Amino acid sequence: MKQEIKNKILLFDELIEKVRIHRQEGKLVVQSHGVFDIIHPGIIRHLNEAKERGDVLIVTVIKDKDVRKGPERPIFQEDLRLENVSSLEQVDYC
């Protein structure tokens, strides 16, 4: 995984600190929360619209154990889902 993608994936405490800093700078932080198991055009559209509503887009990914979309889900484990989402240019942090 590229370093710039790794840098977007933060622990919860690190994410809270980033939000605090951005808010102090007067930036509007927006969040999208979901499974993000399969990145399809609807997800891209949703994230684009979310990014347009603020300065910083944070995406939080539901943990594998908490996914309730059926017995075969998630298709991809949470580490891969995090990597996929953080690879998107409109996402600032995961």
Region roles according to the model:
Residues 1-94:
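Nucleotidyltransferase catalytic core that binds NTPs
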